[in-house]
Design a protein with these regions (language model features):
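N-terminal loops that bind phosphate or other acidic moieties
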Residues: 1-210
Length: 210
């Protein structure tokens, strides 16, 4: 694998980790509207571990690196978030295994692996008012742009925009999974905290792309 390809993966993960830590209160406040309010705390603790271990993580290839991330966050994130995020990174790692380069198709495969892992681990799908309602349509849009021959910058921008659009749209949905589902119809009117967190993270990744 090229050094540049691995560097891109490292950048994405490092940006994700920094945003999760910096936005702890914001994500927690979002989650507290109809959830248990621990999303910000859980993500921050998990990705603090990633940042603390950063220099010692194995970097043989993208798959190995992502597997190390999965293990790091799973060891620190409690509740339901740990298994979900850990599984997402493990599935992304599996999708990247054997890849010599990380091109657009590989990114889509990694995102599909991550969302499939979240579906299986969380017993959730589109329409349940979770981060899947933002990440899956975003991945679909990315794949469509790639097929149309859009530039890398156009693809990244469109991906982030679609994730944000769909995250905001979860405010019209009733939660069917997680603590928010206990609120029933009262969950309508506010967006899913996980979906918004993913949108914020991806917007930061795209805005600061090196």
């Amino acid at each position: 694998m090229s050094t540049t390809a691995l560097a891109d993966v490292e950048y994405v993960v490092h940006s994700l980790a920094q945003t999760a830590v910096e936005k702890e209160k914001e994500f927690g406040d979002l989650d507290a509207v109809v959830g248990d309010g621990d999303l910000g705390y859980s993500l921050a603790r998990g990705f603090e571990k990633v940042l603390a271990d950063w220099d010692s993580l194995k970097r043989d290839d993208a798959a190995t690196f992502l597997q190390q991330i999965a293990l790091a966050i799973s060891s620190r994130i409690g509740g339901t978030s740990g298994p979900l995020w850990g599984t997402a990174f493990l599935r992304a790692s599996a999708a990247a295994k054997g890849a010599d380069t990380i091109d657009g198709a590989a990114v889509v495969a990694m995102l599909r692996g991550a969302t499939d892992g979240i579906k299986a681990r969380g017993n959730s799908d589109l329409g349940d008012k979770t981060l899947l309602d933002a990440l899956i349509p975003g991945t679909d849009e990315l794949e469509r742009r790639l097929a149309a021959g859009a530039s890398p910058e156009e693809c990244r921008t469109a991906f982030a925009a679609k994730v944000r659009e769909c995250a905001d749209a979860t405010s019209t949905m009733e939660a069917k999974r997680g603590r928010a589902s206990y609120s029933g119809e009262r969950s309508i009117g506010s967006p899913d905290a996980g979906a918004v967190a993913v949108a914020v993270i991806i917007e930061r990744i795209v805005a600061d792309w090196p």
